[in-house]
Amino acid sequence: MKTELTLNVLQTMSAQEYEDIRAAGSDERRELTHAVMRELDAPDNWTMNGEYGSEFGGFFPVQVRFTPAHERFHLALCSPGDVSQVWVLVLVNAGGEPFAVVQVQRRFAPEAVSHSLALAASLDAQGYSVSDIIHILMAEGGQA
């Protein structure tokens, strides 16, 4: 019997359990990615894309990228797994630098991620630089 991937289940899964689902195959990984995506709110006019193969490098069982229409940067939410034992929200400039972990979560906290996304969208709309957005998100988000 398959476990339904509810928010509670996502919040209690270990890094190894995320890796086990990834190893189970592409259908299971897609289901896991979609379960995470359902819990998140992308800002208006931003795209939300999940990784299903290795489009974004394939380092994490779940990676969801949020990108504003201008595509100058991405915010990537990465699940626990072999690379990291915690959830991380990373801001990546389109050119690759600056790059920074702007939020770390011991357990999946979609409200904190959605808040950081909304804040980034607001700062971006106000004309803040990518570097300034990184610093503000790091000060605001930190550890959840």
UniProtKB/Swiss-Prot annotation:
It comes from the Bacteria. Pfam families: PsiB (PF06290). Keywords: Plasmid. Inhibition of the induction of the SOS pathway. To PsiB protein of plasmid F. This is Protein PsiB. It comes from Escherichia coli.
